[in-house]
């Protein structure tokens, strides 16, 4: 699972948040400048939700979520998403992840709205699933800790990455585990 407000507000790292406080401020400045440019131009610039800050505080963002072609020696997470969204397995011509990007300033809507703020108020049975090798695993583990329900389960799927759990191409989705959780908790 992804906590999208955390992902946009703190950057997605490999098992932890990526932005420092200075990085976060730089991203906010960048997005606010872009918002003014968009207003002045009467149109918006496309962009993804993952914004990069280098060691000197310079901010850069791509004009699309995934590249047209995969670069040599890609980051494993980029390859994972590319192999799903840009290939027949998950491609759709109207999918933002497959072919384009959102409005570049879209992260502003998420950055100051922590989605899990009220997770402790969730008292219904809750099943959270993540892959053992998912770069996003920390989102699921933290969400599980925050959920207020006594009837909750965190399923960490052995050997699975984030995208393995989109469909069952890799044969890793534990449907029997899900069925048992639902039989036990949905009455």
Predicted segments — roles?
Residues 1-82:
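Alpha/beta-hydrolase-fold enzymes
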Residues 154-156:
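Conserved beta-strand scaffold positions in the cores of enzyme catalytic domains, especially
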Residues 158-187:
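Catalytic active-site module of serine/aspartate enzymes centered on a nucleophile-bearing elbow/loop
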Residues 83-105:
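Flexible internal linker/loop segments at domain or repeat junctions
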Residues 122, 128-130:
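Short beta-strand/loop motif that positions the catalytic acidic residue
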Residues 110-114, 130-141:
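Conserved alpha/beta-hydrolase "acid-adjacent" motif
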Residues 119-123, 146-150:
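Short, conserved loop/helix-junction motifs that constitute active-site signature segments
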Residues 100-118, 124:
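Active-site nucleophile elbow and catalytic-triad environment of alpha/beta-hydrolase enzymes
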